[in-house]
């Protein structure tokens, strides 16, 4: 695969305006079958030394899904690092919305290389727009004592839980009016599977005292055990999937169709042990605070055997609240779908 030479690293560019649409174009690049993350997350070297991907995975706002950007940035960094060590930390800033159908260009610059650690900086761009900035750190690993927090007690195994898609089908009468395109795609990804714990409570009830969301997730298309970089990038892809909604639990009842514009601002993943995303992983997510329209979500990721394999943190933007006469806030909700605009 050959890509044209692009001059230099483009300057950071602000988004022209906030993207508040909730009626997106949900298409993805036809060269990706929406199943194989090995295709979606792959990057190819260009003649200019950067890495490129033509593949797109659109979110519900019609922009590039953040997990795709995290995973592709990790793969670009791993290619530049030549597989000398696994990733131990990824720190990302999402700078502007990515546009589906426009190739991503990843410029990688080595910040540090030591005997056991190295750090690669990745800038992901579309033309003059900088979409993502990431620092990806690698560590060879060293022998040392280990400790893990215990897996939460009382969590049902994934085999006893319904998929997110099935929960939404079973609870269709609880869903607010949604555009048909959005309703058809909710929880209907073919690349990963998510099975929430206590799904109805989280999706449709408000807990004013704490924010907690537990769910099992895995990749559906097998990834070869020797493809360590891709396995880690696949967890990067998974790490943004439904995770930001954790911070909404104390604020709203129904988490779907709020009418809010939700966007990832920054995102971090720490890899503690080798991870196999083909197997079920338990995400135990909480949120300590939401303020100034920003919510922080954190999570511990457990393997099926109970080991802590990763930790996550993400700050998200929740924009569009309406304020009543008493100073309280509520989500605006979605407009009623109409046959005239093809959403019924």
Q: What are the residue ranges of the model-derived segments?
A:
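Terminal targeting signals and extreme-terminal segments of soluble enzymes
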Residues: 2-344
